[in-house]
């Protein structure tokens, strides 16, 4: 019985010590590398984007090419500019991106996700507006696998009665 009593006392002492920090929100601090850049990884479908941002004039480079040549369609450029517009930080950061996998739409979504995360690493106070718009959430939708006995994931083979 004496051991149970002492273990209970130990548990209560531990709860008392940790009880104050238990309900507090985590404090987000600025995370920069040795070159003064913020780094983040974004994902969408099969695409993975690695994003570095630093203060600058608004130059965006994707896989060592200007964003206008890599993402030729204006809709794709608009997608990856969205976090900057929500945060009112357009033309304030130089952005370097390496993106692999997937198609152009998935890559643009991955860059948007990574850019939003990198902005929160550089300026933690931007976390709430970017989170409110859903840019910090990884989109879990991926392609459904093909099933055997079917032509595609859900499409059946053509059925003939006779």
UniProtKB/Swiss-Prot annotation:
UniProt cross-references to InterPro entries, sorted A to Z: Ribosomal_Su5_D2-typ_SF, Ribosomal_uS9, Ribosomal_uS9_bac/plastid, Ribosomal_uS9_CS, Ribsml_uS5_D2-typ_fold_subgr
GO molecular-function term, one example from the UniProt record: RNA binding
Keyword terms of this UniProt record: Ribonucleoprotein, Ribosomal protein
GO CC terms in record: cytosolic small ribosomal subunit
Gene3D superfamilies noted in UniProt: 3.30.230.10
The keyword Disulfide bond is assigned to this record: no
GO terms classed as biological process: translation
HAMAP family linked: Ribosomal_uS9_B
Name assigned to this protein: Small ribosomal subunit protein uS9
Taxonomic placement: Bacteria, Pseudomonadati, Pseudomonadota, Alphaproteobacteria, Hyphomicrobiales
